[in-house]
A protein has these predicted regions:
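Signature of dsDNA virion morphogenesis modules
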Residues: 1-185
């Protein structure tokens, strides 16, 4: 299966929305934060209504299928993730969200209130929330003030973030002698 590296281009929009989805492509669910600490989703406090999750993980293969049924993987290098994260906020897209990438299900009263790129394996804030992901991972915190959306979180109908964006792709020629992870450490 072909693998493509995602490239941020100034001519493209980059990430312009982050959807709430049941099955995130990065295969990691968000956690919900209570007033005192991280708790199971079923016991979430109504007070804070914060969702914390990785948005993109560097060099993690993400399975895709195009309109013609061709299967392939994409990866986001660290430098692309950093540029996409910065551009997302620079363009003022922190209120752009929907359910399952459906433009008819645009969300109101949700905002990305915090975001960071993991830079430290020992002291990064993500560790406090139970995430053990590589440096270069983009994390975000969404404040949910919409009752209907919060109910979907509590019911487990949405479990993570998934980006919407426009990027260029560059095909990668993988060595037959090395595993995917070895080539992108």
């Amino acid at each position: 299966m072909d693998t493509f590296k995602v490239i941020f281009s100034e001519e493209k929009e980059g990430v312009f929305a982050i959807s709430l989805v049941e099955n995130p492509a990065i295969e990691i669910d968000f956690i919900a934060l209570s007033k005192k600490n991280i708790i199971k989703l079923a016991e979430v406090s109504e007070e804070k209504r914060l969702l914390i999750s990785p948005v993109l993980i560097p060099n993690q293969p993400i399975y895709r299928r195009d309109d013609q049924g061709n299967e392939f993987n994409i990866i986001f290098p660290e430098e692309t993730i950093l540029k996409a994260q910065q551009n997302f906020y620079k363009q003022g897209f922190q209120r752009n969200s929907n359910i399952e990438h459906d433009d008819n299900l645009t969300l109101n009263d949700v905002t990305f209130v915090e975001s960071w790129i993991k830079e430290d394996d020992t002291h990064d804030k993500s560790l406090k929330y139970g995430f053990d992901l590589p440096n270069g991972t983009w994390f975000a915190v969404m404040k949910v003030e919409n009752d209907e959306t919060w109910q979907k979180v509590k019911n487990g109908e949405v479990k993570g973030f998934s980006i919407e964006g426009n990027f260029d792709l560059e095909k990668i020629n993988l060595s037959n002698n090395m595993s995917f992870k070895e080539q992108f450490r």
